[in-house]
Regions:
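Structural microenvironment flanking redox-active thiols in thiol-disulfide oxidoreductases
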Residues: 88-129, 140-146
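A short beta-strand-turn-helix
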Residues: 46, 55-75, 147
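Conserved redox-active cysteine motifs that mediate thiol-disulfide chemistry
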Residues: 71, 79-96
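Short loop/turn microsegments at loop-to-beta-strand junctions
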Residues: 52-53, 74-75, 154-156
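Hydrophobic beta-strand anchors of alpha/beta hydrolase catalytic cores
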Residues: 76-77, 110
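Thiol/disulfide oxidoreductase modules built on the thioredoxin-like
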Residues: 127-132, 138-186
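N-terminal targeting signals for export/organelle localization
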Residues: 1-51, 191
Length: 191
């Protein structure tokens, strides 16, 4: 029997780039078969310092990757979708400031994970944004749901250290936060 209960307590919600954003003092609780997961105000159900939930993703070229097989590498997951305007804004910066700088580093992996879209749409999306970093398919948003509430918005980056633990979580696109993400990746790869 599957039991899913979602509670939301908030002093308010606001619209931002077509996403509903819960205010900072919000609490969300999601229960799945006796497993209680608390979400932060951005919808994340994981926290910095925790082991990143494992998953298997199929890339647009057909390659299949399991996150746990990347242990020992710095991994950046970028949750995205073609219909997301903020994602489209952020992706060229990820391409230029992160991917092109580190794509030849054997200790770094970047995977864009496209939420619930078919292969042809994801390929067209990559072409229209000009990104060359690997994109994976997330049918049903099952990978996304390991990191955030399934019904929360995208434009999320998850930075995972070589030890498999989450080092940084971002939501939406903020220049200062993005600069910190780039700096953190650079620092982690110097070690």
């Amino acid at each position: 029997m599957n039991l899913i209960v979602l509670f939301k307590i908030s002093t308010g919600q606001r619209k931002q780039n077509n996403d509903t954003v819960l205010e900072k003092d919000s609490i969300e609780v999601k229960m799945e078969e006796n497993n209680v997961k608390k979400a932060d105000s951005t919808g994340y159900i994981v926290k910095v310092g925790e082991m990143a939930p494992d998953f298997t993703v199929t890339l647009t070229d057909g390659e299949t990757i399991t996150l746990s097989s990347l242990r020992g590498k710095v991994v950046m997951l970028q949750f995205t979708a073609s219909w997301c305007g903020v994602c489209r804004k952020e992706m060229p910066f990820i391409e230029k400031d992160i991917w092109l700088k580190h794509r030849n580093n054997p200790d770094f992996v970047l995977i864009g994970i496209d939420r619930d879209e078919p292969l042809d749409k994801v390929l067209a999306f990559a072409k229209s944004t000009g990104v060359t970093y690997p994109l994976g398919l997330d049918p049903g948003a099952d990978i996304f749901a390991k990191y955030a509430l399934r019904d929360s918005g995208i434009t999320r980056n998850v930075l995972i250290g070589a030890d498999g633990k989450i080092s940084m979580l971002t939501r939406l696109y903020n220049e200062k936060e993005f600069t910190l993400l780039v700096q953190k990746i650079d620092e982690m790869l110097k070690k």
